[in-house]
A protein has these predicted regions:
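Histidine/cysteine-enriched polar flanking segments
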Residues: 1-132
Length: 132
């Protein structure tokens, strides 16, 4: 998304990279006050997003199922999905319960140290597919 951190050239370059591996993308603007999308939403499965109230109201995810974060737990939006597991900050018990109630396998992760530098799980991770 277009934001203070990503301009149209960067977003266009990402879409071109996605095309080379068979994916498509769409450029959208982040809602006012949103640093970047991973700050306020995460893809939980092929049709469901975990979102803050602000992202739900933006209309960006119309057509998708949305699970809205409990008030006060907005930083929990930064979730990492690995296969069928969701890595979620252990600091947000209501979010963990909400995801569990919706049938997701949740792995709580301690994040106190990375939160001191205003980072989320995806900011502090490297993920790649193993080449077989």
């Amino acid at each position: 998304g277009l934001s203070p951190r990503t301009d149209r050239a960067g977003a266009t370059a990402l879409i071109e990279c996605l095309k080379t591996i068979g994916y498509k993308g769409e450029i959208v603007k982040t809602p006012e006050g949103v640093l970047h999308f991973k700050t306020e939403c995460s893809l939980l499965d092929e049709e469901t997003f975990l979102v803050t109230r602000r992202m739900e109201q933006s209309g960006i995810f119309d057509g998708f199922k949305k699970i809205v974060l409990p008030k006060g737990e907005e930083p929990a939006a930064n979730v990492i999905r690995i296969n069928e597991s969701l890595l979620v900050s252990s600091n947000y018990p209501q979010t963990i319960d909400l995801l569990d109630q919706n049938g997701y396998f949740v792995v709580p992760i301690k994040t106190a140290e990375i939160q001191k530098i205003d980072a989320g799980l995806s900011c502090m991770s490297l993920r790649w597919f193993a080449v077989k």
